[in-house]
């Protein structure tokens, strides 16, 4: 029942532009709304289920690649990641699936450093500076050390700057370059990772 609900929900999401409110009000095949079907499903299986987030990747400009970890059925699992790439051709499609797997394993916050939320960076910098001060380092060293640590935070959390999980000597950006052709550069347009729970 749950798997069938999820499959139909996914189809409806594609028709509702990832608008969670529209999705909850949408009619399912049995003519009841998603919300009503969700209540009935919760009553039937006795598990708390919520629809917290949705995302839709259209098929215009670029190609979508996915990875499902701990799959219970095709396209359904405990962790799923989807990556939208531009510049991928038939002979280098495997790179899309590998990058989707990388996203599932590493949980980047953004494609590049500039995409990471400024408030999050400020908060992280505050924590880093406090840790350095509490470690007994001289006050004049705090800024210098914190710059290096915040740079590491940005690299670790921006997809293009992350260390490639399949070869720690490379970054994700290196993998994209290696798989690009002379006339087609592979670019990450978007990505998402969802985990059950």
Residue ranges, per PLM feature:
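N-terminal assembly/interaction segments in proteins that build large macromolecular machines
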Residues: 1-197
């Amino acid at each position: 029942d749950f798997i069938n609900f999820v499959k139909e929900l996914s189809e409806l999401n594609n028709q509702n532009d990832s608008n969670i409110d529209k999705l909850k009000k949408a009619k399912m095949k049995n003519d009841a709304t998603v919300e009503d079907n969700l209540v009935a499903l919760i009553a039937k299986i006795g598990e708390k289920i919520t629809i917290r987030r949705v995302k839709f990747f259209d098929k215009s400009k670029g190609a979508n690649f996915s990875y499902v970890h701990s799959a219970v059925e095709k396209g359904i699992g405990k962790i799923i990641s989807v990556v939208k790439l531009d510049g991928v051709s038939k002979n280098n499609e495997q790179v899309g699936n590998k990058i989707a797997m990388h996203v599932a394993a590493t949980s980047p916050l953004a494609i590049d450093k500039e995409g990471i939320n400024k408030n999050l960076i400020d908060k992280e910098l505050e924590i880093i500076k406090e840790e350095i001060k509490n470690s007994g380092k001289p006050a004049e060293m705090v800024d210098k050390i914190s710059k290096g640590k915040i740079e590491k935070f940005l690299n670790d959390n921006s997809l293009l700057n992350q260390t490639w999980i399949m070869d720690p000597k490379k970054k994700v950006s290196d993998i994209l370059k290696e798989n690009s052709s002379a006339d087609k550069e592979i670019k990450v347009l978007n990505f998402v990772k969802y985990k059950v729970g």
